Amino acid sequence: AFADMTAVQEEANSSAHHIAMDAKRHKAYEEAAKLLNADPEEIALVESTSHGLNIAAQGIELNDGDNIVTTNLEFIQVALPWCVIRKEKNIDIRVCKPADERFTAAAFEPLVDEKTRVLVMSTLEWCNGWQSDMKEIGDFCKERGIYLVVDAVQQLGVTKIDTKACHIDILTAGGHK
């Protein structure tokens, strides 16, 4: 039996497959980093946009009394992980609802205070096509020590996203679009 297994292993070397897959993953990190103006070490390949948002929500330390800010036009999965955390901790979820449905730093300003830890939003809204000025919003968040978590699934690969210039702390996007 061992001789048969060895013969099969020589014919169909699964180690070669793993080495090839590792090389492809390494290339994927490099290509994603270029696309986002990030370092390859800053890239994590996850199952989906939703999975990335869940990791973000679980990975940011929130304390009782903290709040997060989001928008009223988000796809449900952008807000859902934070709603789960709200059940575990006494955090407030504040929702930005500008009359013109355009999300700007000025629109977020009234919702932000010293207990705001996270602003979570889409870079480009799925329901109306509004593309927020992420540089403006990123500067706004950085000045206040707020994590900026974005869902970029509608934008990634269509227009440039510079995570460094926009001070984006966590960006998540699936590759299917």
What do the PLM-derived regions correspond to, one by one?
Residues 1-177:
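Pyridoxal 5′-phosphate
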